[in-house]
Design a protein with these regions (language model features):
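Leucine-rich solenoid repeat scaffolds
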Residues: 284-334
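Acidic Gly/Asp/Thr-rich repetitive segments characteristic of extracellular carbohydrate-active
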Residues: 42-77, 81
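The right-handed parallel beta-helix/beta-solenoid scaffold, focusing on the short coil/turn
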Residues: 45, 67, 78, 85-87, ...
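Extracellular beta-strand solenoid repeats
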Residues: 70, 81, 88-90, 98, ...
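Right-handed parallel beta-helix/beta-spiral solenoid domain characteristic of secreted/periplasmic
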Residues: 51-54, 68, 86-132, 154-157
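Parallel beta-helix/beta-solenoid
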Residues: 64, 84-85, 92, 102, ...
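Extracellular beta-strand/beta-solenoid scaffold signature
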Residues: 100-113, 130-137, 157-172, 185-194, ...
Length: 334
């Protein structure tokens, strides 16, 4: 597809008809037929599914660094693993990845190891549903997950035991961006940052009605947990009607505290437990300018074990919270 001898201008519309994804080229007088699609040709190849490749995974396997995989409108039943750096995986219309007949993960961005991460992978404009986990970014850096609808992913074998049922999850991921997604009705929780995920930004997502299967993690909308999960930003999200807490920062017992995380400008409304919770030795985090309303327990209950001196709390809105601020595992700060 690469052609560096372009001398004239071609205007192209990618016409995806009957799942073929054939490009429709309108050529100005005197110009050569050369589809430009939606980006510079020198950026890499464009691989079309299903026109050029029957499955998304076969296109991923053929892609090199800098390539874009454009998936045409349709319903696809497959698990997708992306391990090549700088690959862009994009839905080109109403693209559904359905796991009704499958188990496991819908889309898994997976590096070789924590020290050899996949870099710069993008996943955008997909509906991912009915898997055990929706989109997982693991051993990766500078990934981008945006404009996806991730819903109804549940633990199919042993609810609340195996840890399945998350919508979007970052595991040992760094400097990545999760934005403008809708994450709904996933069995365990909505968005999770775990196990040494650092310097990530989670922003402008809607996270609602997650956690109907959960007991261990209490159906958290956005969970920040695990040793070394530090210096992340959770901002401008709307977290509504989850079965547990809206936002939770908590480290497992016996591990180093979470620190340096920023939780700001979020709206946590009508969650069945606290709107925002800081628990189990999460220290030195900043929680400012959030709006927590109509949650069934206190808007923000720091745990007895937290280092409150290092915890900066201010500018939050707390009203219309139900209950008497008497969670068994937390005290209330107003």
């Amino acid at each position: 597809m690469k052609n560096r001898g372009i001398t004239t201008l071609t205007i192209v519309a990618a016409l995806l008809v009957g799942g073929l994804g054939s490009p429709l080229t309108t050529t100005l007088a005197g110009s050569k037929h050369h589809p430009l699609n939606f980006k510079s040709i020198d950026d890499g190849e464009i691989l079309y599914v299903p026109r050029d490749y029957a499955t998304i995974q076969s296109a991923v396997n053929a892609a090199g660094e800098g390539d874009t995989i454009l998936v045409a409108t349709g319903v696809y039943s497959e698990n997708v693993v992306v391990s090549t750096s700088d690959v862009r995986l994009r839905g080109g219309g109403d693209v559904v990845l359905d796991g009704t007949s499958l188990s496991g993960i819908g889309i898994h961005v997976l590096g070789a190891s924590a020290t050899a991460p996949a870099t710069g992978v993008e996943v955008s404009d997909f509906e991912v549903r009915n898997f055990e986990r929706g989109i997982i970014v693991e051993w990766a850096t500078k990934a981008r997950v945006s404009d996806n609808y991730v819903h109804d992913n549940v633990d199919k074998l042993a609810p609340a035991v195996l840890g399945d049922g998350t919508g979007i999850e970052l595991v040992t991921a760094s400097a990545s961006d999760v934005s403008d997604n809708v994450v709904s009705r996933n069995g365990l929780g909505g968005i999770q940052l775990r196990v040494g995920s650092t310097d990530n930004t989670i922003h402008h997502n809607r996270v609602d009605e997650n956690g109907s299967q959960s007991s261990t993690f209490d159906g958290v909308g956005i969970l920040v947990t695990g040793a070394g999960t530090d210096n992340n930003q959770v901002q401008h999200n709307k977290i509504v009607a989850n079965f547990g807490r809206g936002i939770l920062l908590s480290r497992p017992p016996g591990t180093v505290p979470l620190s340096g995380n920023l939780v700001a400008h979020n709206r946590a409304h009508r969650n069945l437990r606290a709107g925002i919770a800081i628990m189990f030795a999460a220290t030195g985090n900043t929680v400012v300018h959030n709006d927590a309303r109509e949650n069934n327990l206190s808007g923000l209950p720091p745990c007895f074990h937290c280092n409150l001196f290092d915890l900066s709390i201010g500018g939050n809105t707390w009203d219309k919270n139900l209950g008497t601020f008497n969670e068994t595992d937390a005290s209330c700060l107003q």
